[in-house]
Regions:
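Short loop/edge segments at beta-strand edges and connector loops
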Residues: 44, 96, 121, 213, ...
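Alpha-helical recognition/docking segments in bacterial nutrient-uptake
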Residues: 56-60, 64-168, 230, 234
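Bacterial carbohydrate/catabolite-sensing allosteric modules
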Residues: 37, 83-88, 135-140, 145-326
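Residues at alpha-helix caps and immediate loop-helix transition turns in enzyme cores, especially N-
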Residues: 27, 70-73, 130-131, 190-193, ...
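N-terminal helix-turn-helix DNA-binding module of bacterial transcription factors
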Residues: 1-55, 326
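Short beta-strand segments enriched in small/hydrophobic residues
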Residues: 12, 52-67, 169, 177-184
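Short acidic active-site motifs
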Residues: 45, 104-106, 127-128, 220, ...
Length: 326
C-alpha cells in the first residue's frame, strides 16, 4: 500500500525503510510521507513468517578473536561483505567459532536462525562447516580443501598464480637461492601459494628445499626466518606467503646484519599496511579482498533467492613492485 500511495516500487520503499543512500532525498520524502499517512510500521517478524525467511545471514569466522581483530585481510573481507549487504534487508550475524565452539555454531546455523552463511578463513580441520551446503546456502571465502566440499560455492583469488608471479619477479632480479615462508598447510592460501613458489622454481631447475612455515602472523614469520638463516645456506631471495609474516622476517634479517634488498630481495602477498609501511616498502601481491567479500555476499543472496550463481569465482591478483626487490 505504501508503494502504491507513493507511486514507487516496493523495492524503493524497502530502500527507504533501510535508509539506503541510493534513494534521492525527494523520493525518500515522498515515501516517508506515505508511511506516515498510512501509519505503516515495518514488521520483520511478520515478513519472516510469511516468507519463511529470517532475513539474517551468518558470517562464520573459524579463528580466535585475537586473530580476527588484528588481521587486515579478514577486516577487508568483512568490510566488503558488510557494504554489499548495507542496502538490503539482510542483517549480518557474526559467529567467531573456535575449535571448541564449532559444533555449537553448526547447530545454530542449522536451527533455522539464518537464511545462509558465509565462511571465511576456512581450515581443513573445520569439518563442522564442510558439509553445511547440503542443508542451507553457504559460500566460502577460499577454495575448499576437503573432498566433501568439492561441490561448494566459493570465491577466491588465484593464489598460486600470484605466488608464481612474485617468485618470477624475484628471479628476474638475478636471485637464484630463493627461500619461502609458507602459510598453514591446512588452509587453501597456504597450500596454493607454496605450490606457486615451487612451480616457478621447478620451471628454472632451482632448489625447492628452502621452506619454513608460519601461521600468517608477524611472530611466526620472524621465527621462520630465523630457522631459514640458521640453516647456514645462502639465501638471496625470499617469497613470504603474506605481508604480516614478511614484516616479521624483515626484523630478523636486520637483526642478523643483512640488508633488503642488497642481501635478500623480499616479496610478500596481500598488499596491506604491514607491507606498505615496511622499510623499504614491500613488493607484494595485491589481492582484492574487499571485492572478494562483496562477491561472497552477492552470490549468497542469489542462492537464498533461488537465482543462478557460479560455484567457483576466481579473482585475479596484481604484483606491486616496490623497493624490497631492488
Amino acid at each position: 500500500m505504501v508503494a502504491a500511495l507513493a507511486g514507487v516500487s516496493r523495492a524503493t520503499v524497502s530502500r527507504v525503510v533501510n535508509s539506503s543512500p541510493k534513494v534521492t532525498p525527494q523520493i525518500a520524502e515522498v515515501v516517508n510521507n506515505a508511511i506516515a499517512q498510512l501509519n505503516y510500521v515495518p514488521n520483520r517478524a511478520a515478513r519472516s513468517l510469511a516468507s519463511r525467511r529470517t532475513q539474517a545471514i551468518a558470517l562464520v569466522v573459524p579463528e580466535s578473536t585475537a586473530k580476527l581483530f588484528t588481521d587486515p585481510y579478514l577486516a577487508s573481507v568483512i568490510q566488503g561483505i558488510a557494504l554489499a549487504l548495507a542496502d538490503t534487508e539482510y542483517t549480518l550475524n557474526m559467529l567467531i567459532s573456535s575449535d571448541t565452539r564449532a559444533e555449537k555454531t553448526r547447530r545454530y546455523l542449522l536451527g533455522g536462525n539464518v537464511d545462509g552463511a558465509l565462511v571465511v578463513s576456512h581450515h581443513s580441520g573445520d569439518q563442522s562447516f564442510g558439509h553445511l551446503g547440503q542443508s542451507l546456502p553457504v559460500v566460502f571465502g577460499g577454495r575448499p580443501l576437503l573432498p566433501g566440499e568439492s561441490s561448494s560455492y566459493f570465491v577466491d583469488v588465484d593464489n598460486a598464480a600470484g605466488a608464481a608471479g612474485a617468485t618470477a619477479h624475484i628471479l628476474s632480479t638475478g636471485r637464484r637461492q630463493i627461500a619461502t615462508i609458507a602459510g598453514p598447510q591446512d588452509m587453501p592460501p597456504g597450500v596454493d601459494r607454496l605450490n606457486g613458489w615451487r612451480r616457478t622454481l621447478a620451471m628454472h631447475g632451482l632448489d625447492q628445499s628452502l621452506v619454513e612455515y608460519g601461521d600468517f602472523t608477524p611472530l611466526s614469520g620472524a621465527a621462520a626466518m630465523r630457522r631459514l638463516l640458521d640453516r647456514g645456506r645462502p639465501i638471496d631471495g625470499l617469497f613470504v606467503a603474506n605481508d604480516q609474516m614478511a614484516a616479521g622476517a624483515y626484523s630478523v634479517i636486520y637483526e642478523r646484519g643483512l640488508t633488503i634488498p642488497g642481501d635478500i630481495a623480499v616479496a610478500g602477498f596481500d598488499d596491506n599496511y604491514f607491507g606498505a609501511t615496511s622499510t623499504p616498502p614491500l613488493t607484494t601481491v595485491h589481492q582484492p579482498s574487499h571485492e572478494l567479500g562483496a562477491m561472497m555476499a552477492e552470490i549468497l543472496m542469489a542462492l537464498i533467492e533461488g537465482k543462478p550463481a557460479p560455484r567457483v569465482t576466481l579473482l585475479p591478483t596484481t604484483l606491486l613492485v616496490r623497493a624490497s626487490t631492488g
